[in-house]
Amino acid sequence: MKPTILTGDRPTGKLHIGHYIGSLKNRVLLQNEDKYNLFVFLADQQALTDHAKEPEKIIQSVGEVALDYLAVGLDPSKSTIFIQSQIPEIAELSMYYMNLVSLARLERNPTVKSEIAQKGFGE
């Protein structure tokens, strides 16, 4: 059985050379090694956390990022490419996880702390 790799991007705008050098190039290499089950997703629901007031931007970016995936060499016959919001089981799992993690524990997470401070939610 091949190991599984799950990776993706939040479609908040166009991809650029940094995306390619930072991760896309490696995804294509891993895909072509045929040693892994590669799953690449467009995290449109996650993108809404930063762009809730402009969902149309996310919708448009999903298509653009999907085309960019194909352009750099991600091959749907070798990798599974999917959109987060199109998989209902992800929302179901999220509900279970939200019931397991308390607000106090969440607020201790350094990433969450930083975002709360940055967005002024703690005021």
Question: What is each model feature region?
Answer:
Residues 3-123:
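N-terminal Rossmann-like or analogous alpha/beta NTP/dinucleotide-binding catalytic cores
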